[in-house]
Amino acid sequence: MNSIKFPVLDRTTTNSVISTTLNDLSNWSRLSSLWPLLYGTSCCFIEFASLIGSRFDFDRYGLVPRSSPRQADLILTAGTVTMKMAPSLVRLYEQMPEPKYVIAMGACTITGGMFSTDSYSTVRGVDKLIPVDVYLPGCPPKPEAVIDAITKLRKKIAREIYKDRIRPQQGNRCFTTNHKFFVVRSPHTGNYDQELLYPPSSTSEISTETFFKYKSPVSSHELVN
């Protein structure tokens, strides 16, 4: 029998002690065990299914697909999202425990794609329903692109701090402390520019008395003069 030799334990302090923080340890454990909830409604999801095979082997990233949103921390949306499916998608996202992440895969998920042209039943962008962490364009994206999106998400998780995980509102999802983004006032305030509703002062104005003075049809030249 072949003898098994165990390596000699290095007793030096520099190689046997690891200094880290609880935040880094938590990030490392989460990025190494992402459990995705697969939400595929169209053809883009076929490309993700090829990752399950031995050629790409997405299990090496610790991805374990789950069928229940309560056990998942990543939802991967692929395909067209219709108005009828929108409530189901939002319900699945709300049932996922925090912290949770979203990858939008494909042009139809990101912008609505060709199905949103003159369509009243297609959602033009899944980010109108749930916050998105990584956008993956393509029609459809290649499996290598999906792996790249997962790698970028892992890097984002590795840089997170505790304050970034507290996201009570959907509007603050894109703001992270470590990225040093500036908080901009929401444009959807309802206070529209009233100047756009009126013609500029350089145009000719016709008084109400002049307009109602004429009972019979007259030319526009007479009204202006």
Curated annotation (Swiss-Prot):
Please name the GO terms of the biological process aspect recorded for this protein, alphabetically: aerobic respiration; electron transport coupled proton transport; photosynthesis, light reaction
> How is the cofactor bound, as the UniProt entry phrases it?
Binds 1 [4Fe-4S] cluster.
> GO: which molecular function terms?
4 iron, 4 sulfur cluster binding; iron ion binding; NADH dehydrogenase (ubiquinone) activity; quinone binding
InterPro entries noted in UniProt: NADH_UbQ_OxRdtase-like_20kDa, NADH_UQ_OxRdtase_20Kd_su
State its Enzyme Commission number(s): 7.1.1.-
- Quaternary structure note: NDH is composed of at least 16 different subunits, 5 of which are encoded in the nucleus.
Q: What is this protein called?
A: NAD(P)H-quinone oxidoreductase subunit K, chloroplastic
Q: What is the scientific name of the source organism?
A: Lepidium virginicum (Virginia pepperweed)
Q: What is the lineage of its organism?
A: Eukaryota, Viridiplantae, Streptophyta, Embryophyta, Tracheophyta
